Amino acid sequence: MTKSVAIIGAGITGLSSAYFLKQQDPNIDVTIFEASNRPGGKIQSYRKDGYMIELGPESYLGRKTIMTELAKDIGLEQDIVTNTTGQSYIFAKNKLYPIPGGSIMGIPTDIKPFVTTKLISPLGKLRAGFDLLKKPTQMQDGDISVGAFFRARLGNEVLENLIEPLMGGIYGTDIDKLSLMSTFPNFKEKEEAFGSLIKGMKDEKNKRLKQRQLYPGAPKGQFKQFKHGLSSFIEALEQDVKNKGVTIRYNTSVDDIITSQKQYKIVYNDQLEEVYDGVLVTTPHQVFLNWFGQDPAFDYFKTMDSTTVATVVLAFDEKDIENTHDGTGFVIARTSDTDITACTWTSKKWPFTTPEGKVLIRAYVGKPGDTVVDDHTDNELVSIVRRDLSQMMTFKGDPEFTIVNRLPKSMPQYHVGHIQQIRQIQAHIKQTYPRLRVTGASFEAVGLPDCITQGKVAAEEVIAEL
């Protein structure tokens, strides 16, 4: 008898889950329920007058190869693009400083660029050197904040001016609350293995160099995109699973998931009902609490903070903007008096996105705990971005157009202890809800390849239990 699985959510995790379900069992009956009118979730590519603009995620990390492999499987191998490499900067102390060469996420691995940078004072550099002498950092209950860990290893100055701008922005979380073991456990592993974070990351750098030497003609950039945007990946994945028999229902809100020992009843669109053997839930926690909120095991998600952010895109004629910094973008130290947290010079990092003679800039607004995105109109956010960017470049005219995309409560914050909570919840789900999995960014996926990996694992686990 044919088994059936319902997937809630047609974002990258949900579509990937459908792909891997069909890969495991081509005969399985798969239906995706999506409340909106399109697939992709936060992924949204916008094409206008020769521009290709990402309103959500901009790219993915190439060394997490599962997304590249999946792209090849669905026919997009020739569309994969690698970013143009160039200098990245940190805005601190009212100035743009080049990120020291050889550093990995701000951690120095080459002595000369670190010693000569003006971003860190001589005393701050000396303090960072104590990492070579310190014993491994003690954790309480198996976790520690990113801030406490790097402050102990490299000192406060390196933390504030190098580490925090690079790491804090990825997760939209105060680094003194951000869980190390939920986000960057590899740094703790390197510290334990080598007795020093600097030594450990130097080893990591050497491994990457050796890997690159195996493929001398490969592009040097870390990030991948598609020449028609990330939405082209979503569209190809959607078409692939539909060709394999997956049904996708858009504009379909799930009202409830009713459990039983043998099957799950999906209640949708005001009391319509269907029964499935298995369920994969891939929505944000604010949504899945509607169905699991009565279960005390899910109480952790009721107190989980999420940061609201916005991307602000500005398109200029190149004569109307002067930028003396040759690079691909910058991040901002939290000690700086700005509302933006980072900026990508998109036309330099991804030249294919921008017509000849034009400049495309993408700025990010929204810090943990602030309300700047909620408190201002789109026009006001554009003005705020231009005000902040005027500290780094000169505007000689107005942008040809601007786009503001708000992402309300889109970045779940992984506070210290998060990974332990998630493991307990996942164990509870496996025990209490057989053939059902809940997955997505609220658990442990932030990058796009991580979402695909979670979808694959969830699909394989449900298949094994059917």
From Swiss-Prot:
Residues that hold FAD according to the record: 9-14, 34-35, 42, 56-59, 254, 446-448
Subcellular location: Cytoplasm
Any one GO molecular-function label of the UniProt entry: oxygen-dependent protoporphyrinogen oxidase activity
GO cellular component, one term: cytoplasm
Cofactor comment: Binds 1 FAD per subunit.
EC number of the protein: 1.3.3.15
UniProt GO BP: heme biosynthetic process
Activity regulation annotation text: The generation of protoporphyrin IX, but not coproporphyrin III, is stimulated by heme-bound HemQ. This stimulatory effect is mediated by superoxide. Inhibited by acifluorfen analogs.
InterPro entries: Amino_oxidase, FAD/NAD-bd_sf, Protoporphyrinogen_oxidase, Zeta_carotene_desat/Oxidored
Pathway the protein contributes to: Porphyrin-containing compound metabolism; protoheme biosynthesis
Uppermost EC category: oxidoreductase
Named cofactor requirement(s): FAD
Gene3D superfamilies: FAD/NAD(P)-binding domain, protoporphyrinogen ix oxidase, domain 3, Protoporphyrinogen oxidase, mitochondrial, domain 2
Catalytic activity: coproporphyrinogen III + 3 O2 = coproporphyrin III + 3 H2O2
Domain of life: Bacteria
Keyword list, A-Z: Cytoplasm, FAD, Flavoprotein, Heme biosynthesis, Oxidoreductase
Family of the protein in this entry: Belongs to the protoporphyrinogen/coproporphyrinogen oxidase family. Coproporphyrinogen III oxidase subfamily.
Function: Involved in coproporphyrin-dependent heme b biosynthesis. Catalyzes the oxidation of coproporphyrinogen III to coproporphyrin III. Can also oxidize protoporphyrinogen IX.
Matches recorded under PANTHER family: PROTOPORPHYRINOGEN OXIDASE
Descriptive protein name: Coproporphyrinogen III oxidase
Organism listed in the record: Staphylococcus aureus (strain NCTC 8325 / PS 47)
Gene: cgoX
